[in-house]
């Protein structure tokens, strides 16, 4: 079937607009973030070097691979999370029975092996390795390191939280999170994935993702707040960052994510932070399921994919629920106020209407 010339012209204009937006706005955002990352990592590496001197079990895994840092996540242009991978999970079993949405526990495989664990003093009487106890010890060490390190005049611990958070030069926030890497494992709470009726991702990619596994993070879990407090302290938060990044390879998926993050930072950085970059990434993964064929991720389709994601976002905000991609029982809007979600819904709808009705909208956005 021949495509009318006017449709080709509209499509060409949109591709030009998208490419120009990437060259201008997206690249400017990336350049600024790259510069900030260099500064952040210099400070954090120095702090972690001091921590390691005091406690050799906390070895920094923040290494520079040609400008990329393993375990560093950009939350926003001024907020970052750095994962510190801990050693030796050996004598502990991973237990995911579904009672803690988005979380799991690490339990001694045999009570007699308690003394064999590298983390023996953080194991509870019931045999669980307590995420909160490890984080509390790490927090104390980081606070001491901040006072001793070379950047002590520009880095401060953020108080009133059980998280390990630093403020650098008053404007940048960095959370440092202890974690275990769980390679070759796949949690029961994500066992439904991939959905059998959807031909995406390719079985080879699924196999790679499941072999690579996931991470268990020592951080507060909003889903558990107000529940059994003892279990809440012992539980580890499941994270699938590597899996998500692998799934978004190919076609224009990564470019879509960069555009979505840029639009989010410029227009949806709202009170209460209802729309995070992670929510954009999650909705992009759902869009990949809705459009499983590679031809649907050609640059000609990029405008349609981005509009589809914004329409999904409006629907989620109106329903006040955004399920985690791998753990659908976990709601990413948990803890957000209805007012913040309502306000975000109106703002996203305004933005989406502009994008659907004005082919040159990216010049102003």
Swiss-Prot record:
One term under GO cellular component: nucleus
Spans through the membrane: none
Location of the protein in the cell: Nucleus
SMART domains tied to this protein: Mab-21
Keywords on record: Nucleus
Keyword Cell inner membrane applies: no
Pfam family, one: Mab-21
Family: Belongs to the mab-21 family.
Name of protein: Protein mab-21
Organism: Aedes aegypti (Yellowfever mosquito)
GN (gene name): mab-21
């Amino acid at each position: 079937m021949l495509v009318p010339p006017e449709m080709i012209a509209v499509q060409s204009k949109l591709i030009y607009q998208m490419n120009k937006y990437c060259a201008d706005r997206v690249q400017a955002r990336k350049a600024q973030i790259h510069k900030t990352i260099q500064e952040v990592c210099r400070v954090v590496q120095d702090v972690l070097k001091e921590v390691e001197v005091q406690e050799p079990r906390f070895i920094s895994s923040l290494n520079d691979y040609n400008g990329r840092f393993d375990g560093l996540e950009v939350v926003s242009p001024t907020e970052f999370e750095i994962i510190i991978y801990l050693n030796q999970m050996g004598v502990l079993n991973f237990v995911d029975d579904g009672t803690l949405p988005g979380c799991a526990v690490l339990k001694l495989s045999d009570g007699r092996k308690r003394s064999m664990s590298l983390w023996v003093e953080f194991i509870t009487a019931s045999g669980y390795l307590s995420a909160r106890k490890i984080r509390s010890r790490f927090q104390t060490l980081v606070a001491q390191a901040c006072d001793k390190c070379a950047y002590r005049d520009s880095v401060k611990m953020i108080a009133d939280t059980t998280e390990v958070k630093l403020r650098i030069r008053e404007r940048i926030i960095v959370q440092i999170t202890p974690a275990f890497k769980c390679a070759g494992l796949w949690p029961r709470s994500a066992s439904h994935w991939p959905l059998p009726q959807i031909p995406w991702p390719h079985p080879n990619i699924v196999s790679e993702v499941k072999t690579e596994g996931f991470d268990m993070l020592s951080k507060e879990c909003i889903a558990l707040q107000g529940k059994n407090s003892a279990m809440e302290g012992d539980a580890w938060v499941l994270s699938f960052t590597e899996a998500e990044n692998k799934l978004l390879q190919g076609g224009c998926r990564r470019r879509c994510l960069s555009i979505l993050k840029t639009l989010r930072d410029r227009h949806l950085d709202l009170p209460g932070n209802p729309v995070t970059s992670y929510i954009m990434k999650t909705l992009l993964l759902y869009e990949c399921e809705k459009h499983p064929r590679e031809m649907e991720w050609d640059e000609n389709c990029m405008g349609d994919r981005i509009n589809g994601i914004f329409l999904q976002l409006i629907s989620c905000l109106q329903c006040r629920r955004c399920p985690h991609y791998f753990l659908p029982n976990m709601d990413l809007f948990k803890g957000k106020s209805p007012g913040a979600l309502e306000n975000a819904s109106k703002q996203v709808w305004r933005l989406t209407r502009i994008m659907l009705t004005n082919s040159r909208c990216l010049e102003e956005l």
